[in-house]
């Protein structure tokens, strides 16, 4: 997967530049000499968020999807009523399809995030989606689901019993897998194929990698990796997982990275041993940087940890969705991390402008200053 992520774009994809090259000084000069200034391909306003459509139907109008269980699903045509149990799905669906009223049901946790996110400004139709058919652990109430008259339902690939009971009720189910950029690309391709927008999938995926390549080029000469700790909840940290991807590209080391899991129990003695220089608090928890910086947590003394002493504690942002898991805004997560960890390489990069340009390119949406502050304002220490 690493080779795929680090691939170079052809001159055709680099013919137009939407975002300014990141970096400054010698690092920026080196990046420019390696032609990184042409690394971000443009998605035109006419294309974003809806690109030219491509006919994916057979002669009888059937659309064929192969899901991440290797199962073939045949749809009678572009579905008018789509339902998902998967939390990040709505904003990825929106990035591919644009404004629509096709998504009629989603996970209640998706709506919790939606109400805190920029997606509520871009995709107001989602507010009316039903959440009565599923709980936060992805267990489906088939009777409630049937009331939604879904053409297709998206469910996690490991929820075997849930998939079976829906299929037994005559409901078509597409299974998706979580965890990697390859998986994310497959989601985008499946959604695009299903909705008759295959060209849009390529645009999004190419633009994603162009932004990641931009950071890679700016950090090419940087050998100092930041020592960062990822807090997923009180006295819980993230070990191995998707975070390894964005830490690799932003050049940071997680001292808990050899441990397996995303919610590992720890104690303060372990934190003192690791002594991280930067701490990131996940967006799925209610913890805030002030809880550590002001030593508010009972029985825990964070004041002696380098990250706290130096004020380097940050909250992971929520944009269209939380930036923690794989998503279309993962390149923004990487840029945000890289600027914090290596400020000398990104001295001239304005993160507000990066987010603004990204939203215009991907969603064809103009963020206001107030919206930008909602995305980034509370993430700083």
Describe each model-derived feature in a short phrase:
Residues 2-13:
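Bacterial N-terminal signal peptides that target proteins for export
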Residues 12-21:
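Bacterial N-terminal signal peptides
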Residues 21-33, 40:
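Bacterial lipoprotein signal-peptidase II cleavage site
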Residues 37-67, 71-76:
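N-terminal low-complexity, Pro/Thr/Ser-rich intrinsically disordered segments
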Residues 58-65, 72-74, 161-236, 256-258, ...:
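Extracytoplasmic substrate-binding proteins
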Residues 86, 90-144, 152-154:
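A short, structured surface patch at a secondary-structure boundary
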Residues 131-137, 141-155, 171, 267-284:
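Proline-aspartate-enriched helix->loop->beta-strand connector
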Residues 240-263:
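Alpha-helical, coiled-coil/dimerization segments enriched in small aliphatic residues
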